[in-house]
Amino acid sequence: MNIQTTVEPTSAERAEKLQGMGCKRKRVEDIRFTQGKGNYVDDVKLPGMLFGDFVRSSHAHARIKSIDTSKAKALPGVFAVLTAADLKPLNLHYMPTLAGDVQAVLADEKVLFQNQEVAFVVAKDRYVAADAIELVEVDYEPLPVLVDPFKAMEPDAPLLREDIKDKMTGAHGARKHHNHIFRWEIGDKEGTDATFAKAEVVSKDMFTYHRVHPSPLETCQCVASMDKIKGELTLWGTFQAPHVIRTVVSLISGLPEHKIHVIAPDIGGGFGNKVGAYSGYVCAVVASIVLGVPVKWVEDRMENLSTTSFARDYHMTTELAATKDGKILAMRCHVLADHGAFDACADPSKWPAGFMNICTGSYDMPVAHLAVDGVYTNKASGGVAYRCSFRVTEAVYAIERAIETLAQRLEMDSADLRIKNFIQPEQFPYMAPLGWEYDSGNYPLAMKKAMDTVGYHQLRAEQKAKQEAFKRGETREIMGIGISFFTEIVGAGPSKNCDILGVSMFDSAEIRIHPTGSVIARMGTKSQGQGHETTYAQIIATELGIPADDIMIEEGNTDTAPYGLGTYGSRSTPTAGAATAVAARKIKAKAQMIAAHMLEVHEGDLEWDVDRFRVKGLPEKFKTMKELAWASYNSPPPNLEPGLEAVNYYDPPNMTYPFGAYFCIMDIDVDTGVAKTRRFYALDDCGTRINPMIIEGQVHGGLTEAFAVAMGQEIRYDEQGNVLGASFMDFFLPTAVETPKWETDYTVTPSPHHPIGAKGVGESPHVGGVPCFSNAVNDAYAFLNAGHIQMPHDAWRLWKVGEQLGLHV
């Protein structure tokens, strides 16, 4: 007689089956992407759809004397040619920016940067549209050009923004010059100045963080379709923040939000480039409303690099006051911020310079003062958070370079200087001198682990030997050791200090369990490659005990998703991830009531075990979450409404503060300027780790972009405002050939105020990577007394450094 018994899986076995938090779950979205079955904006094809293209200015600053569109309109296949004159009667010739400025949709009377939009041609296909734009005749009167932000603030500098020349008070106080945008100050100026006045050592440098540009695989694009019968507009687009775009379109067009349906399908990368609104979106909407047919706009790569939102262009005069033995007493920083022709920064309204006031970094100092002046120039507008959280990259670059130059002046090892000044674990939560309250951290532990792993002291000994060999003429190669210890600020953000256009920067999650136990969750964020469909499901799997494979995540549809502020600045996990956990716990609390009813016990007699509620002391008496889901729809307890679903709008109590220790070992040939990264080690602490494999992918991607920015990327202009490098022939994008090998590591310091302890990680490798590369280059040349070497550190610039130092024979 065979007796078969069923062995109940252990808690560990059931937890492993869930593929919840901490599991290296493969990205579920990659199945469609790797098979070429993604659904992108350019895949949207509608009956009768037309195509739009822009006539763009060849001048950086010029008055428009006339625009003749007659030849273009006469071309067969052309349906409309829109200019500012056509938009004015609709009050659509200007649009609000996320920074509170107004930006011309189509240039009105004069152009302010090269390739600015002048007219919008609508034709039967993109080829006819391209032909038509060549037939539009624009008569320009060139005006003096300003591309240097310092010259733009000189008393006799030409006026750029004639549309606001009489508005000398902005959202952040008085404008002290007609090209001035804002002056923003924070910190104890009096106390900081007093500390500097009596400091034993003052280290002062000017660090320029050059203009760069996010380079997503997919450019910005949209399809607008107006249903005149219903009075409803559907807008597909590459939107990192679909609900924000819906609000902006409503404000511009006058259409109520319930009549606007915004859909962000699959997006091929964003990196901050797709947060704001662009002229292409507005013109496509207007053309669809006027013509009554769908209109598609897709920008090309040149347009993307030269006209959509740039990043950086910060000129930072940074000072540290210290004792002779290396104790930092104060920081003073003044920034001249080049915002281009319009202030279109994607920053929270109350922070015109973003979170630049994180610039005191990971270091304990009593006082600090920061002042930022924004200025208009004849460049494309922007100032987006390119792989960072609102100017944090600039802030970290400033403090990490300043630490290095202070160490050189003190003749002190820069690692020792950092350790001497770290915020200590027992000081958390730590109130930084410029206002942020750091949540948690163990900086000494992370630094020690990193130094031990790379063999820091052995590397310094090797470097010393190579320097002596170089002086003896035995080698033409120098060695640099770059260090970056960064603290980032992400998770924007708390309603008390973060909003965009007046909308608080909460985020949201709506979770519904079906009768059979499967789940659908809708989020207010929008992935552009971050892997949300995988990681949000893992959070829910852990919280509710339902396998991640039974959970579907939806984003990007404003008709179905709860209102959210989108994905950028590493905010998805700190905000929407928290909302997901809280919504799941609401469901779990209701499920516990149902379990108590079914098991005929009090709720307090139950305990949670991976995927079930069981009676305390009687583990054989339990109800799984799937059983409870079925019961919730078919036999709920009396006076309890059916179903298991919840929504949460999460307003974070604070930001989260991921941190990391990065080391770069670099070898540079002084005769050619060619720099080779021998080793790059990145230790990140992002709090609770949801999916280690996705974290590693994020770190690899961020470091690759950091390598590109530090070692070659730059959007340059000549004196006439001509863009130099608006293609990938000139704008450096590293391939697998150039990209170094990345070595990743971690510590775990959970955020005490976040529901699952997570902090965010997507931006950290870029934030920490850029100064690490730059510090490696500067460290290599330091023994030759080269002084600060500005980025980007391409071979031509490093060859010039060697030439200036007299190293070439």
UniProtKB/Swiss-Prot annotation:
Cofactor(s) needed, names only, are:
Cu(+); Mo-molybdopterin cytosine dinucleotide
**Pfam families in the cross-refs:** Ald_Xan_dh_C (PF01315), MoCoBD_1 (PF02738), MoCoBD_2 (PF20256)
Asked whether the UniProt record includes Thylakoid among its keywords, one would answer no
What does the UniProt cofactor note say? Binds 1 Cu(+) ion per subunit. Binds 1 Mo-molybdopterin cytosine dinucleotide (Mo-MCD) cofactor per subunit.
Record carries keyword Metal-binding: yes
- What class does this enzyme belong to in the EC scheme? oxidoreductase
Per its UniProt record, what PANTHER family does this chain match?
ALDEHYDE OXIDASE 1-RELATED, XANTHINE DEHYDROGENASE
Q: What is this protein called?
A: Carbon monoxide dehydrogenase large chain
Native species: Afipia carboxidovorans (strain ATCC 49405 / DSM 1227 / KCTC 32145 / OM5) (Oligotropha carboxidovorans)
Q: According to the entry, what is the taxonomic lineage of the organism? A: Bacteria, Pseudomonadati, Pseudomonadota, Alphaproteobacteria, Hyphomicrobiales
